[in-house]
Structure formats: structure tokens, C-alpha cells
Amino acid sequence: ILESSRLPSFKEDKVQEQAIHQLKQRGIDGLVVIGGDGSYKGALALSQKGIDCIAIPGTIDNDINGTDETIGFHTALYNIIDAVNKLRDTSSSHHRCFVVEVMGNHADNLAIYSAIACGSEIVITDKTEYDENKIIEELKICEEEYHKKHAILIVSEKILDVEKLANRISEETGYSGRSIVLGHIQRGGSPVPEDRILASKMAEEAICLLEKRKSGLCICMK
């Protein structure tokens, strides 16, 4: 297992050649590359230079073209649900509205799926209409007509300032607005069974392809 980090300079031909030299020096003639779009591009570049590479989709964003599932998505989703369940306990007892920012990097899968699973009152992504005034009105209806003691808003990252929205909720509704950015807690933890099974299936297929000297391919789940 080589491990990795972000390396923008890998786009450069000389850096790719250096990587190939390191691989050959260590007797490595095939790679299974796990990651997202950037990792795929790096794997393709190496395969075009003679290194057998098979790519496996690994990202919590679940936004890789050609596959319905990516390794890590289900675990991140579970982490979000677990966190929101705990927030709901305290929000109910203190009449609060939590504005929860989740990851996704412009993909709305984590926000949409977690909102459905958690039963959140409102979900905001770059594909939904974002109108603060409408959100305030919806929260007033939740409180005054449905007599809800709490509310949960799930928001995709890079959409809005969750702290600013929480402050406005405090000022204009009966709820005490609070914001929380779940951040990298979504990326960690023990993998859930869905991810373990998916990773095992994809790994088996990747190894089979490398044994057949196939290269420049990615594993997909349909």
C-alpha cells in the first residue's frame, strides 16, 4: 500500500516520469489506484506511459461518472446520520434549529440521502432553490402550525454561510439557531458493511484485470 496525498504537480510529465522510475526501482509493474477524479487522471497518465493501472472509485461524494456507488459514501452517510441523531436529541430539549453543513464538493448525494434518512425539515444544495426568506417562513410554519420543538436543516458545503443563517433563524423565529460544520468527521470511522462488501468486490475485479495485463480501466458498480 503506497498511500498518497494531493499532488497537483503530478500533471507535469517530469513528475510522472519520476513516479514511473520509483515504481520500476521497486519492481512494481501494476497499480490499483483508489480515489476520485484527480486519481483517475493520474492513473490514466501512468497507463499511457506503460504502467498497468486499474482505478477504483473511492470518494465520499459518490460523484464518479460510470458507477452508481463509490467506496466511502455509505460510511460517510452513516456518520452524518449518527451525528444528526445526536443533535436532534439536544435540539428537541432546547427548542433549537440546527443548520448542519455536510461535505459533497458540489455533489448533493450526501446532503440528499442524509436529509431523507434523518427526516430533516429542509435540505439545501446547489440544485435546490435557496431563498432565505422562504426558509424562515417554512420554519415558522414548523413551529407555529405543526408545533415542532426542533428543526434540522441539512446544507451542502460551499453553498452558504451556515453560521449567518443560524443567526437569522434565532432573530426571526422562535427557534434558537445553531450551526455546525461536520467536516472531516464524515471521512473517518470504521467502514459500514456496504462499503466493506463493495470494496472487496471491486478489489477482486481489479486484481483479475491486472493479472490479465489489462490497463487504463476503472471498476464500476451498476
Q: At which residue positions do the language-model features occur?
A:
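Short, high-confidence coil segments that cap the C-terminus of an alpha-helix
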Residues: 28, 148-149, 215
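Accessory alpha-helical/coil subdomains and C-terminal extensions
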Residues: 33-35, 43-45, 72-176, 180
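Glycine/threonine-rich beta-strand-loop-alpha-helix active-site module
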Residues: 49-86
